[in-house]
């Protein structure tokens, strides 16, 4: 079995998807949580000056989505056929667009930037939500299961549900009117390995 080391800050953020994949697969890994003050020294040594980083027997992989895809395929959480794998990638690429549109709102709500919270909710969060959540619901309905693609959980389900749950904790009515997505999130978070990790993981604001 390869030796895995995941390096990210002591928050959920872009590192949590990989942690969830490891826990769902039941694969041991080193969860290296970097202190903010240690980041400037490490940053120039990373491929793109960003975290997370995954080390596999010492070989480094950067970029969160690349890490998710690699781990998903390694652990059988990427779809059962080439077409399912491609559909998983497609849905997650759309979800990344959604998260990119929400980023200005997150930076204000989380206190990284000053701004009018009500304004960013109205002008950024609500339009992005109303544009993208129906697309996710469409894929969920098309699958005919409790997952976005196929009949079993994929890495994209793990990342998407955790991100949406985080947004719902930040904006309580974020999923209002989207009962199907709420049930989807609840189902994935009740998977035994995921439920155990959520109960045990360090409590962080995001």
UniProtKB/Swiss-Prot annotation:
Catalytic activity, EC: 2.5.1.18
Q: Which SUPFAM superfamilies match?
A: GST C-terminal domain-like (SSF47616), Thioredoxin-like (SSF52833)
Task: Report if keyword Transferase is assigned.
Answer: yes
**Keywords, ordered alphabetically:** Transferase
As for family, the record states: Belongs to the GST superfamily. Sigma family.
Q: Which reaction does it catalyse?
A: RX + glutathione = an S-substituted glutathione + a halide anion + H(+)
Domain named GST C-terminal: residues: 81-206
- The GST N-terminal domain sits at 2-79
Q: Which gene encodes it?
A: GST1
GO BP terms in the entry: cellular oxidant detoxification; glutathione metabolic process
Known CDD domains for this protein? GST_C_Sigma_like, GST_N_Sigma_like
Function, as annotated: Conjugation of reduced glutathione to a wide number of exogenous and endogenous hydrophobic electrophiles. Can also function as a GSH peroxidase.
EC supergroup of this enzyme: transferase
Name of a matching Pfam family = GST_C_3
Q: Which GO terms describe its molecular function?
A: glutathione peroxidase activity; glutathione transferase activity
Where is glutathione annotated to bind? Answer: 8, 39, 43, 49-51, 63-64
GO cellular component entries: brush border; cytoplasm
Q: Which organism is it from?
A: Ascaris suum
Protein name as it appears in the record? Glutathione S-transferase 1
Q: Which domain of life is it from?
A: Eukaryota
């Amino acid at each position: 079995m390869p030796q895995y080391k995941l390096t990210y800050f002591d928050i959920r953020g872009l590192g949590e998807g990989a942690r969830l994949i490891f826990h769902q697969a039941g694969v041991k890994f080193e969860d290296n949580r970097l202190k903010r003050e240690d980041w400037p020294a490490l940053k120039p040594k990373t491929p793109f000056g960003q975290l997370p980083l995954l080390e596999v027997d010492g070989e480094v992989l950067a970029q969160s989505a690349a890490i998710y895809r690699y781990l998903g395929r390694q652990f059988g959480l990427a779809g059962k056929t080439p077409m399912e794998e491609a559909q998983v990638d497609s849905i997650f690429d759309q979800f990344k667009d959604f998260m990119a549109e929400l980023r200005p709102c997150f930076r204000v709500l989380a206190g990284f930037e000053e701004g009018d919270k009500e304004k960013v909710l109205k002008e950024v969060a609500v339009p992005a939500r109303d544009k993208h959540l129906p697309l996710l619901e469409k894929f969920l309905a098309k699958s005919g299961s409790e997952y976005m693609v196929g009949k079993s959980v994929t890495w994209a389900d793990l990342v998407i549900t955790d991100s949406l749950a985080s947004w719902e904790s930040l904006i309580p009515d974020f999923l209002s009117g989207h009962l199907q997505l709420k049930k989807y999130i609840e189902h994935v978070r009740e998977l035994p390995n995921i439920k155990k990790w959520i109960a045990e993981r360090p409590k962080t604001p995001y």
